[in-house]
């Protein structure tokens, strides 16, 4: 594996080359979740779209646990790999896979038991509750596939092989959309058809990804290594838990804020659901830069090159600025067309106004989450997790407080006004921590 470009090539080039396959892969992943919503909205009903939307923020939390856990484990793997300790690399990878698979089974069982209760507590409109429960139960049954897929992808990224999960994701995405159309349009399975299509597609990706991972290790000629090492769990958990918090902050905020949106009825929920699907796609470049900066920082600190870490952070901010400008140019003129792709020609006025209003406002503020993600990636890669975690909790608190306190008084618009305020606050706290230079000393310890 000749993947030392993260510690040798120019920072801008290294980050872009590393992040690009992740961006493309995540775009495909978000595209097929968007396709789920669009197919349900067009071929079933607006209420079916609202049901999937009612489940979305909750399912996103589990996705974030999987992604955050994978990122946390990948920092440890990246350090071993950057230091050329390949046996420890292999052991750390398998330990992460075993630990997070066990966690996914436990969470899946809990989800199946409490899915209806959770949706009721989130104030889900009664006319879409049963549909949302059906969708969630199938989702929870497939949770191990979701966790395995995301952790495997993170392991490939840590090894500098970010193109491998991309290939499987492209296949899985195309297969998922085809199954969506077959099960929803032809077999009339409604929201359950969408859930089954996702489960099957992710299962295939997991099997293929694991086979290739084993093959990649054989190419390294590592020899025998332990498949599970308990001593690796604590350092992984120390980084994984704050990473999960960081990844979940947005989704937990979305879930609590959605409970406010739910109170405005299923039509507003349908429009909001369409908008946040698009928002998730817009955030993909920044999440990918976050992952790239994290691995870049970990590998360069492992190679004892602090100067390159700072150079990489500056390069990441330039990438964030470029993507932010691109998003403004794409979203602002076309938000009505984008929302109508989900709602169809017979979408209600309330749904259209809600979706368009959200996107039109948010398009100007994606730079805030981008700059936040860049500095968060550096802090996490260096293992500086304390203030990192505090910043993300502040983000969550502000978003939820502003939405829940002011939306019932001033209207639904307060829901989206709360979002950039939280992002900006998070960035300020994380950036000030970066400027102190504590991350250098923490890594050395």
Task: Give the role of each language-model region.
Residues 6-43, 60-72, 76, 101-108, ...:
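N-terminal transmembrane alpha-helices
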Residues 70, 139-157, 165-173, 194-207, ...:
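Short runs within selected transmembrane alpha-helices of multi-pass transporters and secretion channels
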Residues 49-109, 146-165, 271-329, 333-335, ...:
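Small-residue-rich hydrophobic transmembrane alpha-helices
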Residues 61-64, 176-180, 206-210, 281-284, ...:
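Hydrophobic transmembrane alpha-helices of multi-pass small-molecule transporters
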């Amino acid at each position: 594996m000749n993947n030392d470009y993260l510690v040798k090539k120019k920072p801008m080039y290294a980050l872009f080359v590393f992040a690009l396959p992740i961006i493309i892969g995540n775009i495909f992943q978000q595209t097929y979740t968007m396709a789920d919503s669009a197919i349900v909205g067009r071929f079933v009903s607006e209420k079916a779209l609202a049901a999937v939307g009612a489940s979305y923020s909750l399912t996103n939390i589990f996705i974030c646990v999987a992604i955050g856990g994978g990122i946390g484990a990948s920092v440890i793997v990246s350090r071993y790999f950057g230091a050329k300790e390949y046996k420890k690399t292999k052991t750390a990878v398998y330990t992460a896979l075993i630990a997070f698979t066990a966690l996914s089974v436990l969470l899946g069982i809990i989800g199946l038991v409490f899915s209806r209760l959770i949706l009721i507590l989130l104030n889900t409109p009664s006319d879409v509750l049963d549909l949302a429960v059906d969708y969630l139960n199938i989702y929870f049954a497939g949770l191990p596939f979701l966790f395995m897929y995301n952790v495997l992808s993170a392991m490939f990224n840590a090894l500098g092989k970010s193109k491998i999960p991309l290939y499987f994701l492209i296949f899985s995405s195309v297969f998922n959309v085809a199954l969506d159309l077959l099960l929803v349009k032809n077999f009339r399975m409604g929201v359950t058809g969408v859930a089954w299509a996702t489960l099957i597609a992710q299962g295939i990706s997991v099997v293929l990804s694991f086979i290739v991972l084993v093959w990649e290790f054989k190419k390294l000629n590592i020899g025998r290594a332990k498949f599970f090492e308990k001593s690796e769990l604590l350092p992984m958990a120390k980084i994984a838990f704050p990473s999960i918090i960081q990844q979940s902050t947005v989704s937990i905020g979305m879930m609590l804020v959605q409970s406010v949106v739910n109170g405005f009825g299923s039509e507003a929920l349908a429009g909001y659901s369409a908008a946040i699907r698009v928002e998730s796609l817009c955030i993909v470049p920044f999440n990918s830069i976050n992952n790239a900066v994290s691995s870049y920082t970990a590998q360069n600190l492992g190679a004892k090159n602090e100067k390159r870490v700072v150079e990489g952070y500056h390069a990441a901010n330039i990438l964030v600025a470029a993507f932010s400008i691109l998003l403004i140019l794409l979203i602002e003129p076309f938000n009505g067309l984008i929302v109508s792709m989900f709602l169809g020609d017979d979408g209600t006025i309330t749904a259209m106004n809600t979706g368009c209003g959200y996107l039109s406002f948010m398009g100007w503020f994606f730079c805030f989450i981008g700059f936040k993600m860049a500095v968060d990636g550096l802090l996490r890669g260096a293992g500086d997790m304390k203030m990192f975690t505090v910043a993300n909790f502040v983000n969550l608190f502000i978003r939820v407080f502003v939405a829940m306190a002011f939306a019932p008084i001033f209207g639904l618009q307060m829901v989206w006004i709360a979002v950039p305020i939280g992002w900006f606050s998070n960035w300020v706290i994380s950036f000030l921590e970066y400027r102190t230079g504590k991350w250098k000393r923490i890594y050395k310890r």
